[in-house]
A protein has these predicted regions:
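Single conserved hydrophobic/aromatic residue that forms the stacking wall/gate
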Residues: 1-12
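Glycine-rich phosphate/adenylate-binding loop and adjacent beta-alpha elements
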Residues: 17-88
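Short, flexible surface segments
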Residues: 34-37, 109, 122
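A glycine-rich, Thr/Ser-enriched phosphate-binding loop motif common to dinucleotide/cofactor-binding enzymes
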Residues: 69-78, 95-116, 129-137
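Short helix-loop-beta connector
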Residues: 94-97, 119-125, 201
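Adenosine-nucleotide cofactor-binding segment
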Residues: 128-131, 143-218
Length: 220
């Protein structure tokens, strides 16, 4: 939502878009050793952790009919793409591409926020606002580390039911009830008390997978 507010965020036209995908390698450069033609790979906007390559490579530039198009770091909205090896990861060809295609952003963002950024521990509570692709990935990440409860918050009952299939222990429809009150009710710690001698409540960690003012205020 803040794109264009700072100079470094200004978009350069013409631009080629897309930042996650799965495809088959057709050709590699002479310095590329971790993948080969014929390999199924994932293209992601996050560079691989290569000690010898600490700086992300420059944006790709493509000659088009009426000028030059530039990408942020990768582009995937195309039949073919050219990517620096830092952004290419080999994947199991037996996994459906519908699954691997979203790992490069949605899964890494949601699950990564829970596992790597927040470092949620077993038994800690997590509330996740918005259970689309990123939110569902956060739910899976929370389940993987043994979080409890895992509270999914959304406006769609169908999505909330789907989130439970991924590991959410509770679903809160924010269109029908106050999500803040619901989260407090589900996270009461009977052995901890505040200055008013009331049981402490509230999620240990909350993930905002929507990014609007209302959810941010509710989370805070």
């Amino acid at each position: 939502h803040g794109i264009g507010r700072r100079q470094r965020q200004m978009c350069i036209r013409d631009r080629v878009l897309g930042h996650e995908s799965t495809g088959v390698v057709t050709e590699v450069g002479s310095a590329v050793t971790h993948v080969a033609p014929g390999d199924m790979v994932m293209v992601t906007w996050v560079p691989r952790n290569i000690e010898s390559e600490t700086q992300p490579p420059a944006a790709a530039q493509l000659q088009v009919s009426d000028g030059v198009a530039v990408s942020q770091n990768v582009f995937t909205w195309a039949d073919h793409t050219i990517a620096d090896q830092q952004y290419v990861v080999k994947v199991d060809p037996n996994i459906d591409t519908d699954v691997t295609a979203i790992i490069g952003c949605a899964v890494m963002t949601g699950a990564g926020a829970v596992i790597n950024t927040a470092k949620v521990q077993k038994g800690e509570s997590v509330a996740i606002f918005g259970v689309g692709g990123v939110g569902l990935s956060a739910v899976v990440g929370a389940k993987m580390v043994g979080a409890h409860p895992i509270i999914a918050v959304d406006l769609d009952d169908e999505k909330l039911a789907f989130a439970k299939q991924f590991g959410a222990t509770h679903g809160v429809n924010a269109a029908n009830e106050d999500p803040v009150a619901a989260i407090h009710a589900l996270t009461v710690r009977e052995v901890e008390f505040n200055f008013s001698q009331q049981p402490v409540s509230g999620a240990d960690y909350t993930c905002d997978c929507i990014g609007i003012r209302q959810t941010m205020e509710q989370i805070v």
